[in-house]
């Protein structure tokens, strides 16, 4: 709405002047003339035109100055901006280069890390596979170790069983040889021609050994070619292998010629040839190829040093010999006790569970190992063999007056029947002293103790042949081991001279004195053999086996042939006997008997052939334990073994 013609214009002019004043106050360089009103400028221009022109000129100059100043400042800012932009561009390029370098480095690191990861993965897989392989090998080796341990255990059990069976078999054969020595010949000796050819060859080999020569024949033609039972027993006797390991450190070079047959006289004790020259002896290696049976070893095979013997072969040989002995002396025994009564045992020895059948395989192993022995090892073996078997005999029972009287009673009839001039030749044993016959003194006779006299009355000197045939029955361990020797009424007869020294002289010794107390003493043949038959649970002398020579019968036992074989009465002794046994065991100083320890079956069943000379050490009273200790049941008891030996004919000579 319009309110007047002049009023709106007047208001607009006032507003413009006010705006210009504000603009001037806000910017100092704005000229002051611009802020003046147009009316004021017109009034000044009308009043003084020259003054107005000068003010305008001043304002123009001031504006030019200000414009130049602003332009210069803008140029400077532009230069600064350009320089800053250039610097920033350079910095940006540098940062980009560094970024590229860092990126490349990171890329390489990442690639290396990936490669290392792949390598680590491959190595882990390889290690895992190797670990699995080694675990499988470990399990396989563990199974092999378990199997080898089981095999070793089985081998150890087998070795122990074979050792026990071998010891048992050796004692049985030694017992058979001892019974052959002590058996009754009924005035008829074995002739050399009656023996089997193989046994004759063995006898010849035994005679060719140094110190093993056969005795010279007597002057009577009836005994011209007879073979004494002692020589037969020596050939049939089984040796005690013993332990060779303790003597291997003391070797000597003097036995190097032994395998070649160059042994010198006196290099070892000569009596060993009497005992260790049998078919199963492990100590005569140079003659073993001649002693072996052709069924086990071929004629062309090379017998090595220290080759093992097959025990069943030697048993078969002994059976053949016993069969020949049975045919030769059949008239001396009843028909019920000949080999025909035991038809199942006429052939070779069957291999039982007790005597194992591993000897053939072990013989092959020994044959393979024999070629690896050197001369020094052979010398060590020979020297240890010489030292091992040079032991002293236990001759306590040989010095008993009752033993001498019993042996003399047996030897008296034969001494009267033989030629009076039985010559004494040079002894084939260089190490033994000469022993001439002496009439006085309790010197034991030549003949061994007669087992048949043990069953006769004390006054009888010898059984009649017919009575022996009628009353004969097999002896057992209980019959012989428990009964004392009978007191013979006959005086001791002088010893019979023989080329090799007396049999009793060499086997049982001559040591003893007048103070020997032999009352109730058990037979020396079965003494320690019976002692080994003790069970381990017997409470006798605090669980230890007592020397059987102290075990006496409780009463006066009848030794008639019809007497039955009862158990040993001294094993279940009365109170008085037990007290007497304790006195004999503990009070050694009050007893005239020498104190002896436990004797193994080897010492009494396999007597040594060395003479009991005065040079023997009297202080050596103890003997070692058996080489193979008895452990458990071997499947064959001692009495069964004796029965088997009886059935095989070892008592039929």
From Swiss-Prot:
Residues with Phosphoserine modification: 249, 278, 295, 314, 400, 427, 523, 533, 535, 558, 560, 564, 613, 623
Membrane topology: Peripheral membrane protein
Protein role: May sustain the structure of the postsynaptic density (PSD).
Assembly information from the UniProt record: Interacts with DLG4 and DLGAP1 and forms a ternary complex.
Protein name, UniProt field: Brain-enriched guanylate kinase-associated protein
Name of the gene: BEGAIN
Source species of the chain: Ovis aries (Sheep)
Record carries keyword Transcription regulation: no
One GO CC term on file: synapse
């Amino acid at each position: 709405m319009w309110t007047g013609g002049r009023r709106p214009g007047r208001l607009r002019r006032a507003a413009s002047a006010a705006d210009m004043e504000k603009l001037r106050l806000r910017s100092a360089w704005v000229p002051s003339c611009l802020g003046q009103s147009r009316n004021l400028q017109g009034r000044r221009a009308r009043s003084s035109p020259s003054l107005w022109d000068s003010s305008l000129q001043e304002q123009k100059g001031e504006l030019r100055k200000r414009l130049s100043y602003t332009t210069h400042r803008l140029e400077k800012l532009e230069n600064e901006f350009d320089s800053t932009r250039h610097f920033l561009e350079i910095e940006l390029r540098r940062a980009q280069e560094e970024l590229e370098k860092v990126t490349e480095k990171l890329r390489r690191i990442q690639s290396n890390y990936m490669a290392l990861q792949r390598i680590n993965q491959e190595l882990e897989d390889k290690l895992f596979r190797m670990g699995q392989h080694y675990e499988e090998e470990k399990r396989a080796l563990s199974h092999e170790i378990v199997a080898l341990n089981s095999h070793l255990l089985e081998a150890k059990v087998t070795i122990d069983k074979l050792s026990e069976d071998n010891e048992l078999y050796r004692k049985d054969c030694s017992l058979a040889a001892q019974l052959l020595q002590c058996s009754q010949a009924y005035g008829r000796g074995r002739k050399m021609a009656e023996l089997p050819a193989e046994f004759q060859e063995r006898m010849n080999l035994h005679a060719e050994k140094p110190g093993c020569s056969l005795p010279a024949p007597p002057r009577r033609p009836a005994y011209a070619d007879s073979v004494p039972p002692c020589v037969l027993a020596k050939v049939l006797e089984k040796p005690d292998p013993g332990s060779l390991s303790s003597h291997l450190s003391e070797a000597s070079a003097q036995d190097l010629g032994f395998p070649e047959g160059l042994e010198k006289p006196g290099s070892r004790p000569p009596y060993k040839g009497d005992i260790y020259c049998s078919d199963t002896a492990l100590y005569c290696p140079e003659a073993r190829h001649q002693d072996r049976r052709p069924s086990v070893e071929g004629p062309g095979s090379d017998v090595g040093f220290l080759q093992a013997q097959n025990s069943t072969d030697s048993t078969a040989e002994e059976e053949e010999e016993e069969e020949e002995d049975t045919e030769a002396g059949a008239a001396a025994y009843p028909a019920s006790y000949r080999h025909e009564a035991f038809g199942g045992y006429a052939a070779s020895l069957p291999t039982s569970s007790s005597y194992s059948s591993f000897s053939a395989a072990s013989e092959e192993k020994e044959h393979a190992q024999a070629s690896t022995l050197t001369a020094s090892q052979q010398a060590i073996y020979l020297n240890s063999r010489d030292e091992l078997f040079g032991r002293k005999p236990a001759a306590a029972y040989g010095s008993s007056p009752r033993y001498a009287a019993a042996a003399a009673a047996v030897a008296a009839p034969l001494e009267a029947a033989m030629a009076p001039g039985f010559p004494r030749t040079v002894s084939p044993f260089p190490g033994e002293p000469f022993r001439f016959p002496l009439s006085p003194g309790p010197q034991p006779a030549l003949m061994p103790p007669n087992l048949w006299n043990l069953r006769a009355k004390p006054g009888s000197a010898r059984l009649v042949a017919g009575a022996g045939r009628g009353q004969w029955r097999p002896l057992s361990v209980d019959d012989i081991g428990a009964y004392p020797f009978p007191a013979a009424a006959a005086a001791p007869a002088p010893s019979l001279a023989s080329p090799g020294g007396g049999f009793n002289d060499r086997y049982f010794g001559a040591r003893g004195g007048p103070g020997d107390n032999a009352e109730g003493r058990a037979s020396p043949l079965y003494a320690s053999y019976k002692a080994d038959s003790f069970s381990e649970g017997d409470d006798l002398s605090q669980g230890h086996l007592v020397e059987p020579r102290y075990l006496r019968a409780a009463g006066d036992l009848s030794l008639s042939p019809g007497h039955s074989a009862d158990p040993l009465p001294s094993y279940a002794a009365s109170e008085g006997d037990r007290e007497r046994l304790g006195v004999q065991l503990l009070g050694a100083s009050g007893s005239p008997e020498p104190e002896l320890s436990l004797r193994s079956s080897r010492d009494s069943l396999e007597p040594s052939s060395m003479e009991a000379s005065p040079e023997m050490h009297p202080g050596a009273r103890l003997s070692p334990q058996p080489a193979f200790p008895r452990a458990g049941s071997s499947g064959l008891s001692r009495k069964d073994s004796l029965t088997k030996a009886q059935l095989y004919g070892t008592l039929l000579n």
